[in-house]
Amino acid sequence: MEVAMVSAESSGCNSHMPYGYAAQARARERERLAHSRAAAAAAVAAATAAVEGSGGSGGGSHHHHQSRGACTSHDPQGGRGSRRRRRQRPEKKKAHHRQSSFPHCSDLMPSGSEEKILRELSEEEEEEEDEEEEEEEGRFYYSEDDHGDECSYTDLLPQDDGGGGGYSSVRYSDCCERVVINVSGLRFETQMKTLAQFPETLLGDPEKRTQYFDPLRNEYFFDRNRPSFDAILYYYQSGGRLKRPVNVPFDIFTEEVKFYQLGEEALLKFREDEGFVREEEDRALPENEFKKQIWLLFEYPESSSPARGIAIVSVLVILISIVIFCLETLPEFRDDRDLIMALSAGGHSGLLNDTSAPHLENSGHTIFNDPFFIVETVCIVWFSFEFVVRCFACPSQALFFKNIMNIIDIVSILPYFITLGTDLAQQQGGGNGQQQQAMSFAILRIIRLVRVFRIFKLSRHSKGLQILGHTLRASMRELGLLIFFLFIGVILFSSAVYFAEADEPTTHFQSIPDAFWWAVVTMTTVGYGDMKPITVGGKIVGSLCAIAGVLTIALPVPVIVSNFNYFYHRETENEEQTQLTQNAVSCPYLPSNLLKKFRSSTSSSLGDKSEYLEMEEGVKESLCAKEGKCQGKGDDSETDKNNCSNAKAVETDV
């Protein structure tokens, strides 16, 4: 492995290797080439001397040998199109072979073809020696094409055809090079082409992973969670399938996925496979600066102090509206309000008694001077103002009206205007009959009931309600299964208890639909007791119904609880991360760009030695580290001394 990597680096193929290690490899390669040239020159000189000593055409032979010597010394830099890497041969061995071979060639062949014969004999000897060296080195050698653009590895594998031995040559491209990854002492080995499938990730990008390379051990070292890396490596091997090991917690594996930079798409798909919904993307802010400030003021209470004040006012108005909605249903307030509404409708036949009607008519009470109506009007004015302002400043009208919270705002406002329009129409049109008045009262009661949805407006300012909403959205499939199982159980046990109680004259189950209520109450383990079986068969059916209800409800509950825990812990971690980011460094004299870089770091460590050095340099260059500030003057305030102490403490930690 090391031989292949060194050879490839000498030709400029292994761009993923660190610069220092590559420079050492190139130096060793240049030294090897220098020894090869010296050995070749010595061998040619010895062969030339032997030929001249034996007689013959010495001048022409000397001229040819000199030419070949020059060519041989220049060949490693650009002579052949395909060169084979071999080890350094002893100089005496080469000299011996050439002295024993060249004299015979000069005796047998004419001087004009002597150079050709010498070259053939020399190449045959070199090929034989190369084959022996390849067998000793594991039958592995390196080759490069004419232009140096493509690096490849050739492996001689034994043939399995039963023909008595032999080897077959197999060529591998540069990406098939094997790479060793050490994760906290556990070594993994894979091919470079496997990691290159995802070039944007930490392991797939040569520049990103270079900082973790250990040149002494020729491997990449990561001080990370070991069980998680099995799934990380499988992500590359499988082409993008990310599966969490059962022995790794969800939050730890999520941190590992973020560290290896597998991407947001892979992380979102992994969370979906785990049963969680996609996180909502942050909505873009308006481009206009004025609209942006208004949007932050009404939409994000944590953005500023005025925004928190507006949020508090909104919560108080919502609570007042809900309290008024509940108080107006009390008997002492409900009777007077119904009478006022009847008078506003233009008559009081059938609705007003003889004592209350003259009193209300003489006092001039109408729906418009009712205290509950006045308070309700004030609340609606605030809700309408808030809704219109947010609609004006929103970055996208389409997304604004698709938001469930904005739909709740519209539903909570509309009943007031419908009620107001109905009252005005009745006052102008006068009484149109008792039947029409009764219908108007029924419609108004339904519309007033819709106001109860205002309580969901609190979820805009409550993290707990938001977590509950996310949990229900993530558990829609489980809730659907629960309702489906309950529906099947209600049908089965309602039919069974009806036929079990059919012969009992005093039974409560007169029909199967009458038994639906009993089945629902029994399966949910509520048990009001208003309907109960009397016969033995009915009691047996009731027992089975209760057991089936417990099992049906218990099955999807763990999934719902798991979703709630996930969203709750995620919200808690976000709050802790925000606090740690805001309180990263307490010394006010540190450079702002240094603090910004430190706070923007998503990892628990700065990760690189250069960043540590930059941190240390920034602390030293800060005002706190100056001797004149920390030591010079005696009239420094206590705050300055504390800041200087903090700066020195930070410098020591770095």
UniProtKB/Swiss-Prot annotation:
MF terms per GO, please? delayed rectifier potassium channel activity; potassium ion binding; voltage-gated monoatomic ion channel activity involved in regulation of presynaptic membrane potential; voltage-gated potassium channel activity
Extracellular face of the membrane: 328-371, 426-440, 499-512, 533-539
Q: Which residues lie on this side of the membrane: Cytoplasmic?
A: 1-305, 394-404, 462-476, 569-654
Q: Where are the transmembrane segments?
A: 306-327, 372-393, 405-425, 441-461, 477-498, 540-568
S4-S5 linker: where is this region? 463-476
Question: Sites of glycosylation?
Answer: N353
Mind listing the GO biological process terms from this record?
action potential; potassium ion transmembrane transport; protein homooligomerization
Q: Do the record's keywords include Isomerase?
A: no
Motif residue range(s): PDZ-binding: 652-654
Q: Where is this motif: Selectivity filter?
A: 525-530
Query: Which spans does this entry mark as compositional bias, Basic and acidic residues?
Result: 630-641
Q: How does it sit in the membrane?
A: Multi-pass membrane protein
Q: Which residues lie within the membrane without crossing it?
A: 513-524, 525-532
Q: Please, which domain of life does this record's source organism belong to?
A: Eukaryota
What cellular component GO annotations does this protein have? axon; axon initial segment; dendritic spine; membrane; plasma membrane; voltage-gated potassium channel complex
Q: Which SMART domains match?
A: BTB (SM00225)
Q: Name one Pfam family in it.
A: K_channel_TID
**According to its UniProt record, which reaction does this protein catalyse?**
K(+)(in) = K(+)(out)
Tissue specificity, per the record, is: Detectable in brain, atrium, left and right ventricle, and kidney, but not in skeletal muscle, endothelial cells, aorta, and liver.
List the subcellular locations: Cell membrane; Cell projection, Axon
Q: Which residues carry this modification: Phosphoserine?
A: S122, S600
Subunit relationships? Homotetramer and heterotetramer of potassium channel proteins. Interacts with KCNAB1 and KCNAB2. Interacts with DLG1, DLG2 and DLG4 via their PDZ domains. Interacts with SIGMAR1. Detected in a complex with KCNA1. Interacts with KCNA2. Part of a complex containing KCNA1, KCNAB1 and LGI1. Interacts (via cytoplasmic N-terminal domain) with KCNRG.
Q: What does this protein do?
A: Voltage-gated potassium channel that mediates transmembrane potassium transport in excitable membranes. Forms tetrameric potassium-selective channels through which potassium ions pass in accordance with their electrochemical gradient. The channel alternates between opened and closed conformations in response to the voltage difference across the membrane.
Official protein name in the record = Potassium voltage-gated channel subfamily A member 4
What phylogenetic lineage does the species belong to? Answer: Eukaryota, Metazoa, Chordata, Craniata, Vertebrata
The gene name on file is KCNA4
